[in-house]
Swiss-Prot record:
Belongs to the methylthiotransferase family. MiaB subfamily. InterPro entries: Elp3/MiaA/NifB-like_rSAM, Methylthiotransferase, Methylthiotransferase_CS, Methylthiotransferase_N, Methylthiotransferase_N_sf, MiaB_methiolase, rSAM, rSAM_horseshoe. It catalyses: N(6)-dimethylallyladenosine(37) in tRNA + (sulfur carrier)-SH + AH2 + 2 S-adenosyl-L-methionine = 2-methylsulfanyl-N(6)-dimethylallyladenosine(37) in tRNA + (sulfur carrier)-H + 5'-deoxyadenosine + L-methionine + A + S-adenosyl-L-homocysteine + 2 H(+). This is tRNA-2-methylthio-N(6)-dimethylallyladenosine synthase. The gene is miaB. It comes from Ehrlichia ruminantium (strain Gardel).
């Protein structure tokens, strides 16, 4: 068997794509290796969202090149940097053998065989008419998922936010059929999966078909919830413009849908939201939060924030701070704005000095971290169901997730007893990024 090394960067969709890549290449005579030195093929599944993504890729390729000089090594660049950079990758790294975009990964077995045979560089960054989901048997991308599994229900984005590369690297919105998604969920359930995460670049824009009728995400969630052995359902990432009534209702009706939503707002300033082309206002976002709370009062919120967007004034930034104070997030991801080549905002004037970006980021993160700790501390003394999915770094430690997406650590004499199980845990302590707890004495083993 030859060695296959895959490194995945960025979002959950890339993790999902890497699983597909692994399972369609293994039949060529490969097995997964964890060390570059053991690899015969290296695949870098890249992300293009953040600053200097391409430079990080070339730096990584430089390290891999040193290994290639000592052995016959096929190097593949996949993912969104591959889509964005295209043949520029061959120019800057002529030792790369294959460049393949995220919508063409299903062609990788053919590309690998061909590249090794003809000894020439090959590129495929098309947006094919036949999607990767239609080209690959569903059984091939459900393998190797353990406790919690991803199902891609939607890809691409039609929103064209002025800072974002996704519409250019992932293409327009595409939704899989209900039948295909449900079949995948059934296979995962039969393999012992307890939690399913429905993923998409703009997942709540889902509009798949079932027997000729269009379904939205709320209806899809309630359909998947009928699978008895699936105990938790989560979806990410959402856009405020695509929140809809049946999704609100699903949060109120479907107990398997966890009380947590990641709903990026990016800014609390309407001026900046317009410049970002977000197509919603801060007030509309707040109303979405209020509507969700009417349907389920204990729901927790996560968001993304960009500070230092071109033209952002102190007042604009303070509007973001006020929004955070009003919503009270349990988690948030925040970043300094960085121009992405090819996006409209990269050409905007009034770029913000990095020093100011850093100051604003620090202030925002201090507030978010304070809210996160306060949210976690409210759990102390309460008992919550925790899904345990991996061992901790210490002996007898096991790590799980609460329904609010908090990591929870417990110590037990037999961690294996609780793996892939949902167990009531009494929370004894809280930190910014995790909880600790104990198994109540009344719980039968």
């Amino acid at each position: 068997m030859q060695g296959l090394y895959i490194k995945s960067y960025g979002c959950q969709m890339n993790v999902y794509d890497s699983l597909i890549i692994e399972n369609i290449i293994k039949p060529l005579g490969f097995s997964i290796v964890n060390e570059l030195s053991e690899a015969d093929i290296v695949i870098l599944n890249t992300c293009h969202i953040r600053e200097k993504a391409a430079e990080k890729l070339y730096s990584e390729l430089g390290r891999i090149r040193k290994i290639q000089e000592t052995k016959n090594l096929t190097i593949v660049v996949a993912g969104c940097v591959a889509q964005a950079e295209g043949t520029e990758i061959f120019t800057r790294a002529p030792f790369v053998d294959i460049v393949v975009g995220p919508q063409s990964i299903h062609t990788l077995p053919e590309l690998i065989v061909k590249a090794r045979k003809i000894k020439k560089q090959i590129i495929n960054i098309d947006f094919p008419v036949i999607s990767k989901f239609d080209a690959i048997a569903v059984e091939e991308y459900t393998k190797n998922q353990k406790v919690s599994a991803f199902i891609s229900v939607q890809e691409g984005c039609n929103k064209f936010c002025s800072f974002c590369v996704v519409p250019y690297t992932r293409g327009e919105e595409y939704s899989r059929t209900v039948e295909a998604i449900f079949k995948e969920a059934l296979i995962l359930a039969d393999s012992g999966i307890k939690e399913i995460t429905l993923i998409g670049q703009n997942v709540n824009a889902y509009h798949g078909t079932y027997k000729g009728n269009e379904w939205d995400l709320g209806r899809l969630i309630q359909h998947i919830a009928k699978i008895s052995s699936i105990e938790r359902i989560y979806y990410t990432t959402s856009h405020p413009r695509d929140m809809h009534e049946s999704l609100y209702e699903a949060h109120g009706i479907e107990k398997k849908l966890i009380p947590f939503i990641h709903l990026p707002v990016q800014s609390g300033s309407n001026k900046i939201l317009r410049k970002m082309n977000r197509k919603h206002t801060a007030e509309e976002y707040i109303n979405i939060i209020k509507t969700l709370r009417k349907h389920r009062s204990d729901i927790a919120y996560s968001s993304d924030f960009i500070v230092g967007f071109p033209g952002e004034t102190d007042e604009d930034f303070e509007n973001t701070i006020r929004l955070i104070e009003e919503v009270k997030f349990s988690q948030a991801y925040s970043f300094k704005y960085s121009p992405r080549p090819g996006t409209p905002s990269a050409e905007y004037t009034s770029q913000i000095p990095d020093e100011i970006k850093s100051q604003r980021l620090t202030k925002l993160q201090e507030l978010v971290h304070k809210q996160q700790l306060e949210f976690n501390k409210k759990m102390i003394g309460e008992t919550h169901p925790v899904l345990f999915y991996k061992k901790g770094k210490f002996d007898n430690q096991i790590i799980g997730k609460t329904p609010y997406m908090q990591s929870c650590y417990i110590n037990t004499e037999n961690p294996d007893l609780y793996y892939n199980k949902i167990v009531p845990i009494k929370i004894t302590d809280a930190h910014k990024n995790h909880l600790t707890g104990i198994i109540p004495h009344t719980l039968p083993v």
